[in-house]
Amino acid sequence: IVASNRDIKVWNLSLGSKLEIKPNFISPEAAELDRIQSEYDVSFVVAGTNIPAGVTKKNMRIGSPADSLNSMVVNAVDFAGNSASYTRIGPVLSFFHKPDVSYYGGDGTVYTDKMVVCKDDMGAAYVAGTSFAAPWISRKLAYLIHIMGLSREVAKALLIDAAAGWNRRDD
C-alpha cells in the first residue's frame, strides 16, 4: 500500500498485540515497519498498545508493532494529563524509550472521561485507548511534514522534544 501511495508520508496504525514484546528482541512486524520507513521515506505513528481487559499487571511492556524503533509510538493520558490506566511501557532493547509521546486517549469509568467518536448510526460513542490518541499525533506529524516542509526526522524530533520537556525522568 505504501509503495502505491508515495504522496502519503504519514501512516497511522491504531492496532497492536495483546502480548508483551520480548526484552532483547524486535518483533518481525516492527522490523518490517522500520524497513518500510527507511525504504519509502515515510513515518508510521503506532498506538502504544493497551493493557488487555482482565489483565491486572500494572507495568506491562508494550506490544508489537509498538517496538518499532523508527515509528512514533503514542501512549494515552487522561484529561488531567495523567498516564491512562491501560497504557503500557517500554523500553525496547533495554534502552530505546518507548512510547515516544502521549496524547489524550480518555480514561475512567464515566462517559465524560472518555473520547467521543462518531458511530455508523450517526450517534456518538464514548471510548478510550491509545488507538484514539495516535491519530492526533499523526495529524500533528503530517502537518509538520506536508505543510511546514520538515523532514520526517526533524518533525518527529520536534514532537518528542515538545512532549518530553527538560525534566524527563525515565524511571
Regions found by a protein language model. Give the residues of each.
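Substrate-binding/access-modulating region of protease and related hydrolase catalytic domains
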Residues: 1-64, 124-128, 132-133
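Acidic, glycine-rich active-site loops and adjacent beta-strand->loop/helix elements
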Residues: 17, 48-52, 77-79, 107, ...
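C-terminal subdomain of the subtilisin-like protease fold in secreted/lumenal serine endopeptidases
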Residues: 146-171
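Extracellular S/T/G-rich loop segment that most often corresponds to the catalytic His/Ser-adjacent loop
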Residues: 61-142
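Conserved structured core elements
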Residues: 23-30, 59, 68, 95, ...
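Flexible, small-residue-rich helix->loop connector segments that border functional cores
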Residues: 2-5, 144-150
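Acidic-histidine catalytic/liganding microenvironments
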Residues: 5, 68, 162
